[in-house]
């Protein structure tokens, strides 16, 4: 199904009553295609029961690729439950030998090559585990799987191979990645709302910018826009999740025109003892030595460098310009830039349309953000413009207030009353006093220890209360939207 750029697909969603089926019964349907989110929440007993079911199924139907894939997803998740016991996980995989048996049953199939790539499987059936031997053929599985990728591939598969190509082939011919992302885009699996959000992020960046992303989820949409839809092709993307692979970092540096002296044997990066320090040095070097403007997303500031965030001195040099943060060693009027982005660059009217609800029972993307949460980001990041517009541009203030109200309407229609992230809960309240409007209350998480005495618990509650505050407050509209009118 091909999809036009920035089209929001409206769908009627029927609410279905909860089934009395158990999870194991539901996931034992022979017609079912399991995705990773189906098995994440299962306990070990449920996983073992499902393993037995699907193992019996592939024994009876040895050529059924979907059944083998289901068995692999279950066994792979079960091996993860060994936690830090790597030997136990390895012994489990060797005992079950799912991928080895798969190679005998469906050799050189897409399913086998995908599973072999994802499972650290040695080349020969029965061969003892040997990381060096596996590493030599690892990429062969990926390349062959990409060649065999079926038309009904899941979003997770598209993103798995996009991540592989980003890491392995940045700076090289982009034909393979472009073809893959074109198929992903045309599949309809990548949400239009997410694509619009990435577009607006790019719209706010100056020409030739470098964008620093935390995970591939921060750049998939931008790459679709760039390689498939042909917009913002001047931007360069650095994904920290791929920075473990030195050729990838070198390719990004070459694209950005940064000195390769960074990689010299006596450099600070080469001498770094911890990967965390390597990542910190990479970002610092990009920011401080690039002649190109450098940006990141607001959520990445605290998630980069293994979720520890940027160092405080570097963080202080990033200025909010709307959806993105811009690095500058010198202070400047970033609020003026944010106003320019809102008034001239961002396309915001799509936020008034009905969001297509995320159906996580079918969404197999590796990196997910609900469409309504993306919309909520606009409110958090643009709300500080409201006082300026109220004082200097009443018409613009009324427009932005109306836009905010419509976003809240959409969120409330999805029965969402708030979000939790960044150590805080954000509660959305409908307020009738003074006229119908919305408020967002930011409340820090209350973390209590069972060993806390009553005085400690009370102190924590007092601290939480002191930090709880209203951070967004819309104003009543002259003609309230239908959602608000229904709450009178």
Region spans (language model):
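Short His-Asn-centered micro-motif
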Residues: 212-216, 241
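Positively charged n-region of N-terminal signal peptides that target proteins for export
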Residues: 1-4
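Bacterial N-terminal signal peptides
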Residues: 7-14
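A cross-taxon signal for low-complexity, glycine/charged-rich
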Residues: 485-488
């Amino acid at each position: 199904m091909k999809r036009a750029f920035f089209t929001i697909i409206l769908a009627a969603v029927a609410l279905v009553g909860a089934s009395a089926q158990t999870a194991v019964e539901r996931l034992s349907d022979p017609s079912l295609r399991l995705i990773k989110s189906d098995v994440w929440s299962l306990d070990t007993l449920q996983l073992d029961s499902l393993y037995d079911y699907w193992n019996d199924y592939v024994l009876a139907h040895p050529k059924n690729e979907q059944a083998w894939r289901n068995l692999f997803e279950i066994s792979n998740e079960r091996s993860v439950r060994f936690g830090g016991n790597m030997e136990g996980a390895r012994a489990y995989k060797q005992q079950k030998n799912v991928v080895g048996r798969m190679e005998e049953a469906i050799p050189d199939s897409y399913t086998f090559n995908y599973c072999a790539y994802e499972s650290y499987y040695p080349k020969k059936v029965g061969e003892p585990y040997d990381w060096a031997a596996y590493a030599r053929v690892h990429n062969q599985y990926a390349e062959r799987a990409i060649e065999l990728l079926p038309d009904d591939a899941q979003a997770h598969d598209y993103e798995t191979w996009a991540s592989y190509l980003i890491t392995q082939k940045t700076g090289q011919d982009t034909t393979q990645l472009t073809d893959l992302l074109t198929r992903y885009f045309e599949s309809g699996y990548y949400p239009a709302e997410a694509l619009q959000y990435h577009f607006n992020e790019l719209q706010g960046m100056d020409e030739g910018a470098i964008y620093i992303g935390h995970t591939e989820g921060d750049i998939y949409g931008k790459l679709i826009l760039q390689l498939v839809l042909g917009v913002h092709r001047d931007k360069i993307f650095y994904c920290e999740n791929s920075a473990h692979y030195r050729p990838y970092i070198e390719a990004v540096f070459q694209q950005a025109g940064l000195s390769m002296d960074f990689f010299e044997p006596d450099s600070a990066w080469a001498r770094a003892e911890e990967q965390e320090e390597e990542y910190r040095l990479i970002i610092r070097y990009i920011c401080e030595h690039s002649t190109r403007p450098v940006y990141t997303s607001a959520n990445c500031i605290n998630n980069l460098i293994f979720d520890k965030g940027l160092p405080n001195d570097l963080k202080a040099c990033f200025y909010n310009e709307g959806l993105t943060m811009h690095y500058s060693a010198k202070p400047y009027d970033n609020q003026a830039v944010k106003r320019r982005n809102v008034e001239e660059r961002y396309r915001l009217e799509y936020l008034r349309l009905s969001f297509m609800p995320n159906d996580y029972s079918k969404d197999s993307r590796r990196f997910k953000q609900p469409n309504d949460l993306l919309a909520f980001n606009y409110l958090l990041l643009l709300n500080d413009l409201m006082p300026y517009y109220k004082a200097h541009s009443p018409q613009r203030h009324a427009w932005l207030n109306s836009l905010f109200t419509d976003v809240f309407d959409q969120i409330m229609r999805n029965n969402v009353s708030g979000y939790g992230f960044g150590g805080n809960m954000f509660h959305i309240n409908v307020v009738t006093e003074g006229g119908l409007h919305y408020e967002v209350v930011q409340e820090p998480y209350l973390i209590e220890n069972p060993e806390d005495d009553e005085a400690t618990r009370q102190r924590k509650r007092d601290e939480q209360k002191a930090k709880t505050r209203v951070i967004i407050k819309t104003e009543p509209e002259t003609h309230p939207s239908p959602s608000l009118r229904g709450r009178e």
